[in-house]
A protein has these predicted regions:
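Membrane-interfacial helix-loop-helix connectors in multipass membrane proteins
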Residues: 72-95, 163-205, 214-235, 254-264
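Hydrophobic alpha-helical transmembrane segments that constitute the membrane-spanning cores
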Residues: 61-64, 144-173, 206, 214, ...
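Hydrophobic alpha-helical transmembrane segments of multi-pass membrane transport proteins
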Residues: 86-129, 214
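Selective transmembrane-helix segments that form parts of the transport pathway or gating/packing helices
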Residues: 51, 55, 59, 98, ...
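Active-site cofactor/substrate anionic-group-binding motifs, chiefly glycine-
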Residues: 46-102, 106
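Short, membrane-interfacial amphipathic segments enriched in basic
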Residues: 1-41, 218-223
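Final/C-terminal transmembrane alpha-helix of multipass membrane proteins
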Residues: 229, 237-253
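Short cytoplasmic-facing helical segments at TM-TM junctions of multi-pass membrane proteins
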Residues: 119-144, 225-229
């Protein structure tokens, strides 16, 4: 019986310890943002790494997501004579759900892994200890520039994904599925509201915060040399992706109260 409760309690305690470390890192980071001078060079370097170098991945993700979603929506809706409603469904779905979630998953895989690997390598090679010896606060030097860059870049990447996805869906619907362009655009404009875009960008910001803190925390906690760095990188991507999917559900339920979907 003791072994049973020990086996049951150990992962639970480890989970709450992990959450506590994330909260402490987040609090430490936000305190540094407001109390320390921003290292602009590091910040701009991270904006390039997170935002600029993620362009191709985001564009491809948005384009093919919008294209296949438009095609699949038309195939189903056309059976009941509502093919012209494809534009509205594609636009609202990409703005509210597909754009933010898929962009976050791509960024978690590309940027989150890089963050965790870079910081983890610095940890196991004692470079972070060297920063402390030089009176440089590791959170201020490593986490703050990445966090701010992610908060700035993530909404822009999601906005780009949404725009490309809607454009790709329009192209497929009009030129490949031969939907009436006038009805397609009319339904899309009628049912897509500013609140749909605001909801998508709000999710983008929250997802960016999750990704950067999970990835940085895993890097800072890396141990056992190269093996530990590899494990930390894998855990950063997996945990970030799961956190995005779980958080998306709760954000959807909350934001639909604030920004209800539909023509109102």
């Amino acid at each position: 019986m003791v072994r049973f409760f020990n086996a049951l309690g150990t992962p639970v305690l480890a989970f709450f310890q992990y959450l506590g470390e994330l909260v402490l890192l987040a609090g430490d980071t936000f305190r540094s943002i407001f109390t320390h001078k921003l290292r602009w060079k590091l910040f701009l370097n991270q904006v390039v790494e997170i935002g600029l170098l993620s362009q191709l991945v985001v564009v491809i993700t948005g384009a093919f997501t919008g294209a296949v979603f438009a095609a699949q929506t038309f195939f189903q809706f056309n059976k009941i004579g509502m093919g012209s409603a494809t534009g509205a469904v594609v636009s609202v779905s990409i703005c509210r759900e597909l754009g933010p979630v898929l962009t976050a998953l791509m960024v978690a895989g590309r940027v989150g892994a890089a963050m965790s690997a870079e910081i983890g390598t610095m940890k196991v090679t004692e470079q972070i200890d060297a920063l402390r010896a030089l009176a440089v606060y590791p959170t201020d030097y490593l986490v703050v520039p990445r966090a701010l860059a992610m908060m700035v870049s993530m909404p822009l990447l999601v906005a780009e994904c949404i725009a490309v996805g809607i454009a790709a869906g329009y192209f497929v619907a009009i030129f490949m599925l031969e939907i009436n362009g006038t009805y397609y655009m009319a339904n899309m404009v009628r049912w897509t509201r500013n609140r749909d875009i605001i909801m998508g960008l709000s999710k983008a910001f929250c997802f960016g915060v999750l990704i950067v803190f999970i990835s940085c925390q895993k890097g800072l906690a890396a141990r056992e040399g190269a093996v530990g760095v590899g494990r930390a990188t894998t855990e950063a991507v997996v945990n970030s992706s799961l956190a995005v999917l779980i958080c998306n559900f709760f954000l959807t339920m909350l934001l639909n109260i604030i920004y209800p979907a539909g023509y109102q």
